[in-house]
Amino acid sequence: FFETIDGDATYGRLHSIISSVASIEEIAICEISKSGGTLETKLLSEYIGSTLEKILKKKPLRIVITGKWSQLEQSALLSNDIVFHLEEMVGGRFSVFSHVGLVPLYLGGYNIELLLQGASSAIEEFVLSPYTHAVSREALWIIDWLSHGRNWYLNFFFDISSVHIGRWFVQLFAESFGKENNPTYLFPVSATGTMDLHSIAQSVYAQSHPWLIEWLRCIPQEDNDVFREARDALYHGALQAAIDQWIPCRKTFIRRSEYDIAQWMQQKMMVIMLLSAICEVDAFDQPLVEMYKSR
């Protein structure tokens, strides 16, 4: 996944991919931009496509996911590329179970049927018992502590493979809840254990008053983690240290599977919807960060 314009990193990863394939037929470029005008995506796609064609002597398969009638759609159709559409009503941060998330994950070898089953189960379980569901409990827990001035919400993942999920969590909460007219602003933070224990955790323990934390432990499906016992001890130690500082904490355990991760992500989206409804904030409108594109 190429997600930022960094020349050295992009060059290194791209040439690593090229050296690992026998022909261009093993490569597909999946370009995602709802507006079709995102500068980073456009530059990356052009650079990757031209580099592959130059070295492997043939254009790679290109798959485009974009909004209808965008410039990207028009250029893709003219080039006979494969095109998937993202509906106008679906915002980027809520698009993980649309073509935006499912197509690249399928290309990457993930089981998207299990992803959809996990997401669907979260919705079905909430509909059956909305007042006692984990989604409702988390939303009310956050609202309660917001009223006490705790507005820094940290999701601390004790699993290095969860770093990208953590970034998605931050974007989801920041763009959905971080609005000018929201007096109960919640500042989302993601950290990864054990790396961030001596950085973010230090700040949390030292300045405990604004924080509330969800401690997440991702459990491998196969019990072959040689460091599991040590990581479990560090997880529980870090959690207990936060409790000793009177920081409100939640514990969450997730199996490292498509089903469980999708279920957790869908629950987070539902939490945001409940929070936004309670605080009368529009979670779906365009965030102010889009201003940079016109500057």
Name each region found by the language model.
Residues 1-129:
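Glycine-rich phosphate-binding loops that contact phosphosugars or nucleotide phosphates
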Residues 260-274:
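Short glycine/proline-rich, acidic loop/turn segments that cap or connect secondary-structure elements
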Residues 9-12, 89-95, 194-198, 256-262:
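A short acidic, often aromatic-flanked loop/helix-cap motif at beta-alpha or helix-coil junctions
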Residues 282-295:
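C-terminal amphipathic alpha-helical interaction region
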Residues 32-38, 90, 104-110, 160-161, ...:
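A generic structural motif
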Residues 78-83, 245-248, 258:
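Active-site regions of enzymes building and remodeling cell-envelope glycoconjugates
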Residues 1, 13-14, 110-114, 124-253:
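Acidic catalytic cores of enzymes that act on phosphate-bearing nucleotides/polynucleotides
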